[in-house]
Amino acid sequence: MSVFNYQKDQQGIVTITMDMTGPVNAMNAEYKVAMHDAVNRLEQEQGLVGVILASAKRVFFAGADLKDLVGATPDHAEDIYRDTQRIKHDMRRLEKLPVPVVAAINGAALGGGYELSLACNRRIAVNHRAVKIGLPECSLGLFPAGGGIVRLTHLIGVQAALDIILGSKQMTPEKALAVGMIDQLVETLDDLIPAAKRWLIDVESQADAARQPWDRKGHKVAGGGINTPKNAQYAAVAPTMLHQKTRGLLPNATAAMDIAFQASMLDVDTALRIESREFVKVVTGAVAKNMITTFFFQLNQINAGASRPQGVAKNPTRKLGVLGAGMMGQGIAYVAAMAGIQVVLKDMTLAAAEKGKAYTIALLAKQTSRGRLDAAKAEVIADLIKPTICDTDLAGCDLIIEAVFENIALKNTITQSTEQYLSDDGHWGSNTSTLPITQLAEASAKPENFIGIHFFSPVDKMPLIEIIAGEKTSDATLAKAFDFAQQIGKTPIVVNDSLGFFTSRTFSTYLDEGAKLLVEGVHPVKIENLAKATGMAVGPLQVQDETSLELSRKVSETWAAMGIVDKWGDGETQRRMIKDMITDNGRGGRHHGGGYYDYHADGSKSIWPGLFELYYDDSVEVVDRDIQDRLMFRQVIETLKCYQTGVLRSVADGNIGSIMGIGAPAHTGGFIQFVNSYGFSAFIQRCDELSAAYGARFNCPEIVKQRAASGELFA
């Protein structure tokens, strides 16, 4: 029995309803057989008026089966090319039928699903928030290879197509209609098939209705080919702009742009072959494997609750207390209110608490002005936040999160004075970024209900929450924090307690190695540029300015008071930087009058000249590769140590946490996947070289040597 239900009605319209094995329709081996057979049958039909391609699933079509792609190697190149061309051949046969074909899009049509709809003459979608239209492949180290680049370029033009493809955009039906990705909307699912049939009947006598635009005589690409004056200007600057964004580290993005340029000048069939050829190169490369592994399989694993205690009932947060209305506290209040949670925002003064709420009001106003949010809805959201100075307003909170300064005495005082207002089943979270949760929990009457909930700044933009389980944290508390993170739309990773946990501990090695290079006499601009060349979003000096040298000073003082100085390595460089930059020169960071950089009134910045006087030595020679590897390997090694000692509970948490929380280069798939891709033997050898040249901080963790001996990848 075919997984494509084939029915022809009395009007001569065939409806093919895709209902494949499994939860979604996917472009796998089953699809290839079913589509090939369906097209064969359609080509032999008599009295055919039109075809409707529909879905029996909630999703129209999910695209390629990534399990078939993640293991691709250069040895599979010929098979992949042949298979890709076979899929495209049947799509071409579908769109070259003598009658028009309609894609009846009832749910998400992403990736291969949207590409399949592009092989239809008309795309009609249900106007519902669950329906998403787009081509997200570039976010997985791939590009649309089922004809998506070629057809979309012809349909809406080079620039518009690349904006969607390179941005991995997923659009609402209304937006997709506005940009020309689909042709028609219906308001309900019941309207979908009737609307498709009406259109087929209406155009029955129109010969061009059955011809794709690119197959019509005299066809020109929307907006013209890449050699038209407007597009030629775009083509002259776009590759450079793309390289600035990707640092040349995402070969899929470069290939996608090149294919679109060529597609605008070539016939469709030639362009489709080029698309297949370039796809083989990309899918068999390391970047695609890294990104598919992490951004698809491991991210889905996390979002599905792999780190959440099993057997604990869902426990959504109803009333949240946020203590401290500063940068972090106001951000937490905003994202919670956006999720419909009642928030009590407490600070030492009412003015400070109200200023914290004003942050939410300002963000809501921006969304309203851009048409993204109804004014009445914005008012409802803002009203969920109650600014206060009264502890009693916290009564009945089922979750309280403190977001005050990194001072253990202050945090302990706040815990003891306010946790009594929690509901009977309430839980306490600390937003500390460095202090051990087990030690903070000693101030609590119920340490089993105490947990770390580490947000990242800015809270409204950063997608990650790091949940830290203390030694006494219960499964119920861990589940509560996990559920809260997902409730506010964040991706949660779960780690065990440790000074600095995972993200702050690993991130600090990036700052430290940047500072070490500076102290050694390396030119600061060279440090910054080579850091970005590895794929890091910003250099270590700039990011230290953003996070604040002054904050580092306070943390250092707190750690000294706790008797844990240098627990994770030599802190001498940091102490020198604090003395040189803050004590001697008053350079505390961007928000403290300047740090490594000077910040100018026009918004620009430049290296503070004092750095050259303090540190730069033009006789120092550190080769570029060593600088890049020192910055990268410090972070990778620290991540491996966290995994080896049990701070990290899973490889997935390490990879996703390093990318979303630390800024690990996307092309690596995260700091643990980096080692899989680099190769164990090569990684061990490079660690030995760096260790011999620069010190024991580059010693290879034992766990890598164990994996090298067993041949087992980190997974």
Model regions and ranges:
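Conserved CoA-thioester-binding segment of acyl-CoA-metabolizing enzymes
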Residues: M1-A56, E78, D83, H89-R92
